[in-house]
Each structure stands twice: as C-alpha cells, then as structure tokens.
Amino acid sequence: MQFQEKEFLPVILGADITAYSLARSFHEEYGIKSLVLSMSEGGYIANSDIIENRIFPGLENKDVLVKHLIEVGKEFEGKKKLIVLGCGDWYVRALIESKKELSPYYIIPY
C-alpha cells in the first residue's frame, strides 16, 4: 500500500468504528496513514494498514490523556501539523477542556 506524505497528521482518540471511519476517510481523500491513540490493541482498528495504533493504558483519565498527547505533540513539533479528533463525547469534552495546554501542538476543531 502506497502512502502520501502530507504536512499534517490526523491524531484520532479511540479504537471504535468511528476511529476506523475517520482514518479511512483521511486515507481515501489524502492517501495518508492516521495515528490512533487507544487503550487496546483489538477492535475495529486491529491489523489496519491505514492506522498506526499507539496503546496507552489509562487514557480514560484526562491527566493521562493530556500527558500522552503532549508527548506525541512534542515528537512531531516542527515536522507536521497535528489535527486531533476524539471518537466519543468524553474525548471531545477532554479536548475542549484541555485546549489551552494542547493548542501549542494540535489543531483542535472543537
């Protein structure tokens, strides 16, 4: 499978069908691979070639989520624009509440 190199990278929170759907949409439109942050290896995103899944236990805790998002943000700082999307109300709420801490690293469309 051929992937395009773009100036942005979708960072998707969660491992459900919505995460897969978002990753697939980005892949179909831009030919890119999405980065998914999840708490598990299985589910709809397992073995997908269009997703890089990074597993972080404890993402249901907002402080843990923000910590890992900042780590990932620093990893790509100056290399790619990161667009973070939450799959589920809880993730979206956490992103909105943490916008100040995360906005140096991410585009947060909420």
Question: Residue locations for each model-derived region?
Answer:
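ATP-binding N-terminal substructure of ATP-dependent carboxylate-amine bond-forming enzymes
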Residues: 1-110
